[in-house]
Protein backbone atom coordinates (compact mmCIF):
# COMPACT_ATOMS: atom_id res chain seq x y z
CA UNK A 1 0.00 0.00 0.00
CA UNK A 2 1.31 3.45 -0.91
CA UNK A 3 0.88 5.37 2.34
CA UNK A 4 0.89 8.97 1.13
CA UNK A 5 -1.85 8.59 -1.52
CA UNK A 6 -3.78 6.46 0.97
CA UNK A 7 -3.61 9.14 3.66
CA UNK A 8 -4.88 11.78 1.27
CA UNK A 9 -7.84 9.53 0.57
CA UNK A 10 -8.25 8.58 4.21
CA UNK A 11 -11.64 10.13 4.69
CA UNK A 12 -13.19 8.02 1.94
CA UNK A 13 -12.69 4.76 3.85
CA UNK A 14 -15.90 3.45 5.40
CA UNK A 15 -16.13 1.88 8.83
CA UNK A 16 -18.37 -1.06 7.89
CA UNK A 17 -16.12 -4.12 8.14
CA UNK A 18 -13.19 -1.78 7.82
CA UNK A 19 -11.08 -2.72 10.86
CA UNK A 20 -10.82 -6.38 9.92
CA UNK A 21 -10.17 -5.77 6.22
CA UNK A 22 -7.76 -2.87 6.56
CA UNK A 23 -5.50 -3.31 9.63
CA UNK A 24 -3.05 -0.77 8.24
CA UNK A 25 -5.93 1.67 7.84
CA UNK A 26 -6.87 1.22 11.48
CA UNK A 27 -3.32 1.96 12.60
CA UNK A 28 -3.16 5.08 10.46
CA UNK A 29 -6.51 6.30 11.74
CA UNK A 30 -5.26 5.86 15.29
CA UNK A 31 -2.09 7.77 14.41
CA UNK A 32 -4.27 10.49 12.92
CA UNK A 33 -6.19 10.76 16.19
CA UNK A 34 -2.96 10.87 18.23
CA UNK A 35 -1.59 13.63 16.04
CA UNK A 36 -4.90 15.52 16.13
CA UNK A 37 -4.98 15.38 19.93
CA UNK A 38 -1.33 16.37 20.19
CA UNK A 39 -1.70 19.38 17.89
CA UNK A 40 -4.59 20.82 19.86
CA UNK A 41 -2.99 20.09 23.22
CA UNK A 42 -0.05 22.19 22.05
CA UNK A 43 -2.42 24.99 20.99
CA UNK A 44 -4.26 24.82 24.32
CA UNK A 45 -1.03 24.88 26.35
CA UNK A 46 0.47 27.75 24.38
CA UNK A 47 -2.66 29.87 24.79
CA UNK A 48 -2.61 29.31 28.55
CA UNK A 49 1.14 29.99 28.74
CA UNK A 50 0.58 33.58 27.62
CA UNK A 51 -0.57 36.71 29.40
CA UNK A 52 -3.62 37.01 27.15
CA UNK A 53 -6.77 38.20 28.95
CA UNK A 54 -8.55 35.43 30.85
CA UNK A 55 -11.77 36.11 28.95
CA UNK A 56 -10.00 35.36 25.66
CA UNK A 57 -8.45 32.18 27.07
CA UNK A 58 -11.81 30.95 28.34
CA UNK A 59 -13.44 31.65 24.98
CA UNK A 60 -10.64 29.77 23.23
CA UNK A 61 -11.47 26.69 25.31
CA UNK A 62 -15.00 26.74 23.89
CA UNK A 63 -13.47 26.44 20.43
CA UNK A 64 -10.62 24.02 21.15
CA UNK A 65 -12.55 21.43 23.17
CA UNK A 66 -15.20 20.73 20.49
CA UNK A 67 -12.52 20.62 17.79
CA UNK A 68 -10.71 17.93 19.80
CA UNK A 69 -13.71 15.92 20.97
CA UNK A 70 -16.21 15.89 18.10
CA UNK A 71 -14.09 13.94 15.57
CA UNK A 72 -13.46 11.26 18.20
CA UNK A 73 -17.15 11.00 19.07
CA UNK A 74 -18.17 10.86 15.41
CA UNK A 75 -15.83 8.02 14.55
CA UNK A 76 -16.29 6.05 17.80
CA UNK A 77 -20.08 6.16 17.50
CA UNK A 78 -19.70 5.04 13.91
CA UNK A 79 -17.65 2.03 14.96
CA UNK A 80 -19.88 1.06 17.86
CA UNK A 81 -23.14 1.31 15.96
CA UNK A 82 -21.74 0.10 12.63
CA UNK A 83 -22.87 3.28 10.96
CA UNK A 84 -21.75 3.96 7.43
CA UNK A 85 -19.65 6.79 8.78
CA UNK A 86 -17.66 8.72 6.21
CA UNK A 87 -15.85 12.02 6.35
CA UNK A 88 -16.26 14.04 3.22
CA UNK A 89 -12.63 14.32 2.20
CA UNK A 90 -13.20 16.11 -1.08
CA UNK A 91 -11.80 19.25 0.51
CA UNK A 92 -8.05 19.54 0.06
CA UNK A 93 -7.65 21.40 3.38
CA UNK A 94 -9.18 18.45 5.24
CA UNK A 95 -6.88 16.00 3.45
CA UNK A 96 -3.81 18.08 4.21
CA UNK A 97 -4.76 18.34 7.88
CA UNK A 98 -5.20 14.57 8.19
CA UNK A 99 -1.81 14.05 6.58
CA UNK A 100 -0.20 16.51 9.01
CA UNK A 101 -1.94 14.81 11.94
CA UNK A 102 -0.47 11.42 11.00
CA UNK A 103 3.00 12.93 10.57
CA UNK A 104 2.65 14.81 13.88
CA UNK A 105 1.76 11.61 15.70
CA UNK A 106 5.24 10.24 15.01
CA UNK A 107 6.74 13.39 16.52
CA UNK A 108 4.60 13.26 19.68
CA UNK A 109 5.02 9.52 20.21
CA UNK A 110 8.75 9.80 19.52
CA UNK A 111 9.14 12.60 22.06
CA UNK A 112 7.27 10.57 24.68
CA UNK A 113 9.29 7.40 24.07
CA UNK A 114 12.55 9.35 24.09
CA UNK A 115 11.75 11.10 27.35
CA UNK A 116 10.29 8.04 29.08
CA UNK A 117 12.63 5.26 28.02
CA UNK A 118 15.77 6.66 26.35
CA UNK A 119 16.87 9.95 27.91
CA UNK A 120 15.78 9.04 31.42
CA UNK A 121 16.40 11.21 34.45
CA UNK A 122 18.85 14.14 34.40
CA UNK A 123 22.41 13.34 35.43
CA UNK A 124 22.03 15.22 38.72
CA UNK A 125 19.16 12.99 39.87
CA UNK A 126 20.43 10.24 42.18
CA UNK A 127 17.00 8.81 42.95
CA UNK A 128 13.34 9.65 42.48
CA UNK A 129 10.46 8.12 44.43
CA UNK A 130 6.77 8.89 44.03
CA UNK A 131 3.87 8.02 46.31
CA UNK A 132 0.19 8.94 46.31
CA UNK A 133 -1.75 9.78 49.47
CA UNK A 134 -5.54 9.83 49.60
CA UNK A 135 -6.13 12.91 51.72
CA UNK A 136 -9.89 12.34 51.75
CA UNK A 137 -9.45 9.16 53.76
CA UNK A 138 -7.17 10.95 56.22
CA UNK A 139 -9.45 13.88 57.01
CA UNK A 140 -12.94 12.39 56.67
CA UNK A 141 -13.56 12.64 60.43
CA UNK A 142 -12.35 16.26 60.60
CA UNK A 143 -14.45 17.62 57.71
CA UNK A 144 -17.52 19.42 59.04
CA UNK A 145 -19.29 19.59 55.67
CA UNK A 146 -18.71 17.98 52.28
CA UNK A 147 -15.17 17.22 51.12
CA UNK A 148 -16.11 18.60 47.68
CA UNK A 149 -18.13 21.82 47.51
CA UNK A 150 -20.55 22.41 44.64
CA UNK A 151 -22.61 20.10 42.45
CA UNK A 152 -20.03 19.59 39.68
CA UNK A 153 -17.06 18.83 41.99
CA UNK A 154 -19.25 16.43 44.00
CA UNK A 155 -20.33 14.68 40.80
CA UNK A 156 -16.76 14.40 39.53
CA UNK A 157 -15.65 13.22 42.96
CA UNK A 158 -17.63 9.98 42.63
CA UNK A 159 -16.28 9.11 39.18
CA UNK A 160 -14.28 5.87 39.48
CA UNK A 161 -10.48 6.18 39.43
CA UNK A 162 -10.49 9.98 39.76
CA UNK A 163 -7.57 11.40 41.77
CA UNK A 164 -9.11 14.69 42.86
CA UNK A 165 -8.50 13.96 46.55
CA UNK A 166 -5.05 12.46 46.12
CA UNK A 167 -1.74 14.14 46.84
CA UNK A 168 1.35 13.25 44.83
CA UNK A 169 4.57 13.22 46.84
CA UNK A 170 7.79 12.98 44.89
CA UNK A 171 11.08 12.68 46.74
CA UNK A 172 14.06 13.50 44.53
CA UNK A 173 17.67 13.23 45.67
CA UNK A 174 20.08 15.44 43.71
CA UNK A 175 23.87 15.43 43.53
CA UNK A 176 25.71 18.74 43.07
CA UNK A 177 29.26 19.92 43.52
CA UNK A 178 28.42 21.96 46.63
CA UNK A 179 30.01 22.91 49.96
CA UNK A 180 29.67 20.25 52.64
CA UNK A 181 27.42 22.55 54.68
CA UNK A 182 24.69 21.94 52.08
CA UNK A 183 24.93 18.15 52.20
CA UNK A 184 21.46 16.81 52.99
CA UNK A 185 19.84 20.23 52.56
CA UNK A 186 16.09 19.60 52.15
CA UNK A 187 13.76 21.73 50.01
CA UNK A 188 10.01 21.13 49.99
CA UNK A 189 8.26 22.41 46.86
CA UNK A 190 4.51 23.00 46.73
CA UNK A 191 2.84 23.94 43.46
CA UNK A 192 -0.64 24.33 41.99
CA UNK A 193 -2.58 24.19 45.24
CA UNK A 194 -5.44 26.07 43.54
CA UNK A 195 -7.51 27.30 46.47
CA UNK A 196 -10.92 27.51 44.78
CA UNK A 197 -13.32 26.51 47.53
CA UNK A 198 -14.27 23.38 45.59
CA UNK A 199 -12.21 21.21 47.98
CA UNK A 200 -12.50 21.70 51.73
CA UNK A 201 -9.87 23.58 53.71
CA UNK A 202 -8.94 20.44 55.67
CA UNK A 203 -7.43 18.99 52.48
CA UNK A 204 -4.89 21.81 52.28
CA UNK A 205 -4.23 21.78 56.01
CA UNK A 206 -3.31 18.11 55.70
CA UNK A 207 -0.92 18.94 52.86
CA UNK A 208 0.79 21.49 55.10
CA UNK A 209 1.07 18.90 57.89
CA UNK A 210 2.69 16.48 55.44
CA UNK A 211 5.14 19.17 54.32
CA UNK A 212 6.08 20.00 57.91
CA UNK A 213 6.66 16.32 58.73
CA UNK A 214 9.35 16.37 56.06
CA UNK A 215 11.19 18.90 58.27
CA UNK A 216 12.49 20.90 55.29
CA UNK A 217 15.29 23.41 55.50
CA UNK A 218 13.44 25.53 52.96
CA UNK A 219 9.92 25.61 51.47
CA UNK A 220 9.21 27.03 48.01
CA UNK A 221 5.77 27.64 46.47
CA UNK A 222 5.83 27.92 42.69
CA UNK A 223 2.56 29.49 41.65
CA UNK A 224 -1.15 28.87 41.20
CA UNK A 225 -1.76 29.19 44.91
CA UNK A 226 -5.25 30.70 44.87
CA UNK A 227 -8.02 31.09 42.30
CA UNK A 228 -10.91 32.61 44.25
CA UNK A 229 -11.00 35.58 46.63
CA UNK A 230 -13.35 33.66 48.93
CA UNK A 231 -10.33 31.54 49.94
CA UNK A 232 -8.13 34.46 51.01
CA UNK A 233 -9.22 33.80 54.59
CA UNK A 234 -7.75 30.28 54.29
CA UNK A 235 -4.18 31.47 53.81
CA UNK A 236 -3.25 31.89 57.47
CA UNK A 237 -4.46 28.41 58.50
CA UNK A 238 -2.87 26.71 55.48
CA UNK A 239 0.34 28.14 54.01
CA UNK A 240 0.73 30.33 57.09
CA UNK A 241 1.48 27.16 59.07
CA UNK A 242 4.40 26.04 56.90
CA UNK A 243 7.66 25.71 58.82
CA UNK A 244 11.21 25.74 57.48
CA UNK A 245 14.54 26.59 59.09
CA UNK A 246 15.61 29.04 56.38
CA UNK A 247 12.24 30.38 55.28
CA UNK A 248 9.24 29.92 52.98
CA UNK A 249 9.51 31.58 49.54
CA UNK A 250 6.97 32.02 46.76
CA UNK A 251 6.17 33.19 43.25
CA UNK A 252 2.74 33.58 41.63
CA UNK A 253 1.35 31.85 38.53
CA UNK A 254 -1.31 32.42 35.90
CA UNK A 255 -4.28 31.37 38.07
CA UNK A 256 -3.28 33.82 40.78
CA UNK A 257 -4.13 36.58 38.25
CA UNK A 258 -7.78 35.79 38.98
CA UNK A 259 -7.35 37.85 42.14
CA UNK A 260 -7.53 41.29 40.55
CA UNK A 261 -5.89 43.21 43.41
CA UNK A 262 -2.29 41.98 43.15
CA UNK A 263 -0.95 44.20 45.93
CA UNK A 264 -3.64 42.97 48.33
CA UNK A 265 -2.93 39.33 47.43
CA UNK A 266 0.80 39.67 47.95
CA UNK A 267 0.20 41.52 51.21
CA UNK A 268 -1.96 38.71 52.60
CA UNK A 269 0.53 36.04 51.50
CA UNK A 270 3.47 37.88 53.03
CA UNK A 271 1.49 38.50 56.22
CA UNK A 272 1.57 34.70 56.59
CA UNK A 273 5.37 34.84 56.74
CA UNK A 274 6.15 33.98 53.11
CA UNK A 275 8.91 35.83 51.25
CA UNK A 276 8.38 37.11 47.69
CA UNK A 277 11.38 36.52 45.42
CA UNK A 278 10.09 37.59 42.01
CA UNK A 279 12.36 40.17 40.44
CA UNK A 280 14.74 40.19 43.41
CA UNK A 281 17.70 38.33 44.84
CA UNK A 282 17.10 36.99 48.33
CA UNK A 283 20.21 35.83 50.17
CA UNK A 284 20.22 32.96 52.68
CA UNK A 285 23.21 32.12 54.85
CA UNK A 286 23.58 28.42 55.64
CA UNK A 287 26.46 28.01 58.08
CA UNK A 288 28.57 30.47 56.13
CA UNK A 289 27.47 29.20 52.70
CA UNK A 290 25.59 31.76 50.60
CA UNK A 291 22.44 30.71 48.75
CA UNK A 292 20.59 33.21 46.56
CA UNK A 293 16.98 32.75 45.48
CA UNK A 294 15.17 34.62 42.75
CA UNK A 295 11.83 34.30 40.98
CA UNK A 296 10.52 34.77 37.46
CA UNK A 297 6.76 35.26 37.09
CA UNK A 298 6.76 35.96 33.36
CA UNK A 299 4.64 36.22 31.31
CA UNK A 300 1.94 37.05 33.88
CA UNK A 301 3.80 39.50 36.14
CA UNK A 302 6.68 41.80 35.17
CA UNK A 303 8.73 42.13 38.38
CA UNK A 304 11.61 40.15 36.85
CA UNK A 305 12.37 43.19 34.68
CA UNK A 306 13.78 44.79 37.83
CA UNK A 307 16.66 42.31 38.01
CA UNK A 308 20.09 43.52 36.93
CA UNK A 309 21.70 41.79 33.92
CA UNK A 310 23.42 38.42 34.41
CA UNK A 311 26.88 39.95 34.72
CA UNK A 312 25.68 41.85 37.82
CA UNK A 313 24.23 38.78 39.53
CA UNK A 314 25.34 38.57 43.18
CA UNK A 315 28.00 36.00 43.97
CA UNK A 316 26.81 32.85 45.68
CA UNK A 317 27.66 29.22 46.35
CA UNK A 318 24.25 28.06 45.08
CA UNK A 319 21.54 29.88 43.11
CA UNK A 320 17.87 28.86 42.94
CA UNK A 321 15.09 30.00 40.59
CA UNK A 322 11.38 29.76 41.35
CA UNK A 323 9.05 29.95 38.35
CA UNK A 324 5.63 28.71 37.29
CA UNK A 325 6.59 28.45 33.63
CA UNK A 326 9.15 26.10 32.04
CA UNK A 327 9.44 28.68 29.27
CA UNK A 328 11.93 30.53 31.50
CA UNK A 329 14.58 27.82 31.16
CA UNK A 330 16.74 29.83 28.75
CA UNK A 331 16.47 32.85 31.01
CA UNK A 332 17.71 30.69 33.89
CA UNK A 333 20.66 29.50 31.82
CA UNK A 334 21.67 33.10 31.12
CA UNK A 335 21.86 33.68 34.86
CA UNK A 336 23.71 30.38 35.42
CA UNK A 337 21.30 29.23 38.12
CA UNK A 338 22.03 25.96 39.92
CA UNK A 339 18.50 24.66 40.52
CA UNK A 340 15.13 25.50 39.01
CA UNK A 341 11.83 24.83 40.77
CA UNK A 342 8.86 24.94 38.38
Where are the predicted features?
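Beta-strand-turn-beta hairpins that frame and shape the catalytic cleft
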Residues: 167, 176-188, 282-293
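Conserved small/polar residues in nucleotide/adenosyl-binding loops
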Residues: 340-342
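A structural signal for the hydrophobic beta-strands that form the central parallel beta-sheet
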Residues: 189, 221-222, 295
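Binuclear metal-dependent hydrolase catalytic cores centered on His/Asp/Glu-rich metal-binding motifs
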Residues: 267, 271-273, 287-323, 329-330, ...
Amino acid sequence: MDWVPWIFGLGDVRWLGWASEYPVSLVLWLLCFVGHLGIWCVVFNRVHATALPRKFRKQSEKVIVPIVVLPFCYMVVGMCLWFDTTFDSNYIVFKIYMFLAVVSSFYFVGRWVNRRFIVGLPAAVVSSERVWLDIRERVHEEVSGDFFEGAVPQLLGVVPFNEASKLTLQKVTLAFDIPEQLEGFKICQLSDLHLTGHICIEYFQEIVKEANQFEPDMVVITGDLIDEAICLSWLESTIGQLKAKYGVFYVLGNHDKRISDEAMLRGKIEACGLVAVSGAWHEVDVEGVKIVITGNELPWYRAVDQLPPPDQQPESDFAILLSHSPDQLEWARDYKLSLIHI
